[in-house]
Swiss-Prot record:
TM regions (residue ranges): none
Protein name in the entry: UPF0178 protein Rpal_2485
Entry-linked PANTHER family: UPF0178 PROTEIN YAII
Family in the record: Belongs to the UPF0178 family.
Source organism: Rhodopseudomonas palustris (strain TIE-1)
Native organism taxonomy: Bacteria, Pseudomonadati, Pseudomonadota, Alphaproteobacteria, Hyphomicrobiales
NCBIfam families registered for this protein in UniProt: PRK00124.1
């Protein structure tokens, strides 16, 4: 069992791995907060909380960023939100399992901004590749590893 101080936040509006988060969180007895712009369905479970943050452009992101703390985990494909969470000392993981780290977030943000600019000028017209079963598997492994890493850090003598 992992320290209950760890909470998993899910940027839930378009998250393809919510079911996987529920399963892993239940196995580790961790609370999950799903944050969306509006109402979303979630399973009835004492560890799962649903938050409708409002319809503002970044309402869900702001809600998460204002509450996340070191030792928490956020699941998001939103790179600016991941950056805010990493800066707060949390672990950020994309739904495809890619971790956002202090070392990688700057470059990831720069590439995101470049791609946004290229799309706005018509230089690039395609989007990201489709979500795959391999992405789902990579995500499960990344989430489980992050939870175990946080638990080890908390258990280490200070």
């Amino acid at each position: 069992m992992t320290d209950a101080l760890t909470r998993i936040y899910v940027d839930a509006d378009a998250c393809p791995v919510k079911d996987e988060v529920y399963k892993v969180a239940e196995r580790h007895h961790l609370p999950v907060t799903l944050v969306a712009g509006g109402f979303i369905r979630v399973p009835q479970h004492p560890l799962i909380e649903r938050v409708a943050a409002g319809s503002g452009m970044d309402a869900a992101d702001d809600w998460i960023a204002e509450r996340i703390k070191p030792g928490d985990i956020v699941i998001t494909a939103d790179i600016p939100l991941a950056s805010r969470c990493v800066k707060a000392g949390a672990t950020a993981i994309a739904p495809n399992g890619k971790p956002f780290t202090e070392e990688s977030i700057g470059m990831t943000l720069a590439v995101r901004n470049l791609m946004t600019d290229l799309r706005s000028t018509g230089e690039i017209t395609g989007g990201p590749r489709a979500f795959s079963p391999r992405d789902r598997s990579t995500f499960l492994s990344a989430l489980d590893s992050a939870i175990r890493r946080i638990a080890r850090r908390r258990a280490a003598p200070t």
